[in-house]
Amino acid sequence: MGFKGYILSIVFNGKDFANKYYLMLKEFLKQHNLRDKIALKVVLANDEPASNLYVSIKSRVAKEIGLNVEVIKFSANSVQSDILEVIDRENKNLSTDGIIVQLPLLKGMDLNSILNSIVYSKDVDGLSFVNLGKMILGDKKGFIPCTALAVLKILRDEGIKTLGKTVVVVGRSPLVGRPISILLSSKPYDATVIVCHSKSIYLDVYLRQADIVISAVGKPRLIDKSMLCGKPYVIDIGISEIETDNGKILSGDTDFDNIKECVKFITPVKGGIGPVTVLMLMFNTIKAHLINNRMFDVLNRLEKLLEV
């Protein structure tokens, strides 16, 4: 769905968006005799219900399109060396194409040490220092973090122009906000990017300048309609639980019901950015297999298919 002219309040359907591409990937793997030949290993080192749900979704999607997936789960009394040992084993395993670590980790574990223990050619979440460096330098053999890649995919497919536009990114984490701001300020996106964070005093002033708002801070209902001007496009990556009279509900960084009529485009909390992030994980995993097996002609076809 592109924007040809002026369209009011498009609520993005990430589930339908991703499902369309899942069918394409499934057929692509079949055509190139790659079904059941690509393996993703998922390291799960926490017992949070949300993490278990996310892992089950990733596993289900991977299996549906034709990837092999194994979840390696660690108990609550596991130590960091246990995880590093498994990652080292899978780094050396020639049949493993991609390795991801489902966050958060158990308390006391060092995030950077674990993420950087994954060899960059299998780091399909794109969170190691090597891949973040490749992203900054524009090395296409590296892996862009999946959420950032999902944002780029949504902008491209929905016809949301970034050239010369003002993009306000709320959040500067190295996992989400920072990669997005770097990518959008680079070629070919060429946006003017303003990065806001917890210490930004005049958030509303910056937001009113935005053609595009991308928020990833995990603060429920941080952004309301009083902070926006000129009907921007809004991509809400944040997700939090809030208490209501009817129990806990999920909330994004935006007050969705409050602002949805004041924007041109918005992603909801449920069925918004999430399914597209999983789609990009599938893309990165297939890409890893193709690069590691020097199947560059097939990789070119994959990139054209998904337009990434």
Curated annotation (Swiss-Prot):
InterPro entries: Aminoacid_DH-like_N_sf, NAD(P)-bd_dom_sf, THF_DH/CycHdrlase, THF_DH/CycHdrlase_cat_dom, THF_DH/CycHdrlase_NAD-bd_dom. GO terms for molecular function: methenyltetrahydrofolate cyclohydrolase activity; methylenetetrahydrofolate dehydrogenase (NADP+) activity. This is Bifunctional protein FolD. It catalyses: (6R)-5,10-methylene-5,6,7,8-tetrahydrofolate + NADP(+) = (6R)-5,10-methenyltetrahydrofolate + NADPH; (6R)-5,10-methenyltetrahydrofolate + H2O = (6R)-10-formyltetrahydrofolate + H(+). It comes from the Bacteria. Homodimer. One of its GO terms (biological process) is purine nucleotide biosynthetic process. It holds the Pfam family THF_DHG_CYH_C. Catalyzes the oxidation of 5,10-methylenetetrahydrofolate to 5,10-methenyltetrahydrofolate and then the hydrolysis of 5,10-methenyltetrahydrofolate to 10-formyltetrahydrofolate. Belongs to the tetrahydrofolate dehydrogenase/cyclohydrolase family. NADP(+) binds at residues 171-173, 198, 239. Keywords: Amino-acid biosynthesis, Histidine biosynthesis, Hydrolase, Methionine biosynthesis, Multifunctional enzyme, NADP, One-carbon metabolism, Oxidoreductase, Purine biosynthesis. PANTHER family: C-1-TETRAHYDROFOLATE SYNTHASE, CYTOPLASMIC, C-1-TETRAHYDROFOLATE SYNTHASE, CYTOPLASMIC-RELATED. One of its GO terms (cellular component) is cytosol. It comes from Borreliella burgdorferi (strain ATCC 35210 / DSM 4680 / CIP 102532 / B31) (Borrelia burgdorferi). The gene is folD. Pathway: One-carbon metabolism; tetrahydrofolate interconversion. Its EC number is 1.5.1.5, 3.5.4.9.
